[in-house]
């Protein structure tokens, strides 16, 4: 513990020293900076040279990782130990993308035979639906899938579909998550029940939002196909076979997963069966392979050359060394536009904790607030604040080096904006440059005195740039695994359990208490504000 405390002190001192300097000057002071802070891994190119650390800051961050025993924690995770201590569970989403026959154990018990058996069932089902061997009740092949889930049962598969979907898919995949009935109505308005397969994703088959939408979907099917016909249009991803049977799902269309797979890590599992069907098994297998490639890198690479470790350390340097409490993730890729929403759950649900496994308060700040959207759209939205606002927000900018999609010339324009923003965030624009430009335009000295400060960019905004060689199932899998392992490393260093989520429970309990009051007029005990709102809604 003393070594860890000392490492934190060194990091904070190094960050303070680096924070008084300009990032662009580090390149002159450190001739090897670009080589030291760029990596090529599994089809991804990472450039961390525009981050706010200098050589001493990077060294202090790596010392902190060693002091926190990141290597030991990494080994314990891959060995299947119960690193989710509050629930006594192993954490083995990595097993879902491991090759058949790999030696993977959860709490000492081999798991790959079961994992591969489920994968083979998924593959057979996906191929049968795509080929038309599995049909609907009226003999028509399925041309659409309605995927119903929420949280990890929605965000991951939805992002995965955006990344993998063909331009003109043979099967239309749509998603419903929210308990707001408008989403269900708008999503299903032009769908044909005779040609739609409904896939319900809920491990316990009790999730309120999911089961409300599942009930609506079943009623929609029954109205068109009758009770028995509706059953032929159902599949489920769940471990509650009694509940799926009662709902009408045939047993051979229920696909399970394991308690060592957390919801926000479950897109590698049968949770994404809908995508495997709609995009094709080869695409889904490529996604698994890309994740496995990043796993191998993370498991074996030394910390100073380890992509997930370095991305995590950059965030810790910003969060804890420089007190940057938010981070913006901007993919310059329409297919990756939902990445920030996915990372909000992955990172903020994993590391949004203020208490460690020992029940003691965390000694330092933990998860940052993650936000973002696709570039170049965000340049016309919140980038004004990013460039000239009073707070500095570190960024991750993500691009795709080569793309054959869309009209000629557009991808180069997209990439030019990506590179320009990364450079502008770092170098900024000096007042002298602005004054010279305005003077050349004949602007008066009085106007220059007021305009120049407004047009000055301080720069010195740190960013990491990630380039995918191409957006393929493999590189997308590597990207998601990169962020998963980054999140794990941060949790280890912060001394928290990244794999439970007690913070989501309280609201569920209270919603279940309030629902009868809205439905039947029952009364309950609430604070004055909540009680007043309930009375207003009862009118």
From Swiss-Prot:
Biological or metabolic pathway of the protein: Carbohydrate biosynthesis; gluconeogenesis; Carbohydrate degradation; glycolysis; D-glyceraldehyde 3-phosphate and glycerone phosphate from D-glucose: step 2/4
Major localization class: cytoplasm
Name by which UniProt lists this protein: Glucose-6-phosphate isomerase
Gene coding for it: pgi
EC number in record: 5.3.1.9
Pfam families the record matches: PGI (PF00342)
One Gene Ontology term of the molecular function aspect: monosaccharide binding
SUPFAM superfamilies cross-referenced by the UniProt entry: SIS domain
Taxonomy, superkingdom: Bacteria
InterPro entries linked to this entry: G6P_Isomerase, G6P_Isomerase_C, Phosphoglucose_isomerase_CS, SIS_dom_sf, SIS_PGI_1, SIS_PGI_2
Entry's family note: Belongs to the GPI family.
The UniProt record lists the keyword Cytoplasm: yes
Active site: 349, 380, 508
Disordered, as annotated region: 519-539
NCBIfam families: PRK00179.1
Keyword field: Cytoplasm, Gluconeogenesis, Glycolysis, Isomerase
Gene3D superfamilies registered for this protein in UniProt: 1.10.1390.10, Glucose-6-phosphate isomerase like protein, domain 1 (3.40.50.10490)
Reactions listed under catalytic activity: alpha-D-glucose 6-phosphate = beta-D-fructose 6-phosphate
GO annotation terms (biological process): gluconeogenesis; glucose 6-phosphate metabolic process; glycolytic process
UniProt keyword Isomerase, yes or no: yes
Cellular component terms (Gene Ontology): cytosol
HAMAP family xref list: G6P_isomerase
Organism of this sequence: Caulobacter vibrioides (strain NA1000 / CB15N) (Caulobacter crescentus)
